[in-house]
Structure formats: C-alpha cells, structure tokens
Amino acid sequence: RQVGPGGHVIGVDMTPAMLAKAERNKARVGLDNIEFRQGFIEALPVADGSVDVILSNCVINLSPDKPAVFREAYRVLRPGGRLAASDMMTIGLFSPEERADLSAWAGCVSGAEDVADYVEAMRAAGFEDISVVDKAAPAEELAGQLPETGPARLFSARVTAVRR
C-alpha cells in the first residue's frame, strides 16, 4: 500500500516456509503488486539498479558476511536509492566467550557488528549519507534481559544510507 498503485514490492527470504507464509499474508490482504523470491541477502535475486528502496528488519546482523550484504544492496539499488535497516549493533567488541553466551541467548544478538565496522562496510560498498540512530528504549529493555558483558554495549539501531 505504501508504494501506491504504480509501485511494486519484492520480498526476499531464504526459507520456503517464510515465503509460503508471506504468500498467505499477501492473499489475505488482497494486494497484487507484491512478489516473493527465494534467495540470500548476500546474493539477491534482483536485477542491477532496479530497486528504489531496500527495507531490512533485524536481518543483516544474521549474515556472517556483512560487506557482501552491503555490496549486494548497492548493486540492486538505483542511483539515489535508499537502504533503511533496523539492526542490532554494538559499541565496542564482545569477547568470543561473551559472543558464545549471547548466541545461546539469541543468535541474532551474537551476530551484532560493532557500529564502526558496520558503517565502514557500508562506505566500502559505496553508500553515502549514512545515519545510525540508537533506538534507546528497546535497547534498554533488552539490556536488562541479556547476560552480563564486558565493556561492549549492545543497542538497537535505525540505519539509513543512500546510493549516489
């Protein structure tokens, strides 16, 4: 609905189960300008320069190859296209032991990247106008549930960037 009657939405997921669920939801709401494709965020099944906006909600941190994710996002975006993501990040680095403990708590948290490394990977892919905003309230709520950690801090971020 947000893209209007002339817009088109492509959803990508790596699992057939999530694609089937997405198709059921699409049928339930009666929209026909949405299509779903099976693929990985490191190798999107989308043509070069064919996308205006990429939205990602707590997925990039799950990838072990974040630079590849950002290169791929840059590849499929048109010039002037925007990437908007919500993701878990850290300020500082967790030790391998802390990451293992976090992984036991929630796999998505253990994949959180240091904000400086995350931004640098975006820059290296070619993105500009990169903004990272700490969504403090959710992070504070989450922090009380996480295992104790050293000097690193986990936070939930809203990230935006532009392909020029």
List each model region and its residues.
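Class I SAM-dependent methyltransferase SAM/SAH-binding core
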Residues: 1-44, 68
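Short conserved loop adjoining the S-adenosyl-L-methionine
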Residues: 43-48, 64
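Hydrophobic beta-strand segment of the Class I
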Residues: 54-55
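A short glycine-rich, Lys/Arg-flanked "PGG" loop and its adjoining helix->strand segment in the class I
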Residues: 67-82
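Short, glycine-/aromatic-enriched active-site segment of Class I SAM-dependent methyltransferases
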Residues: 89-109
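Short alpha-helix
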Residues: 110-132
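Core SAM-dependent methyltransferase catalytic element
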Residues: 125-128, 135-136, 141-164
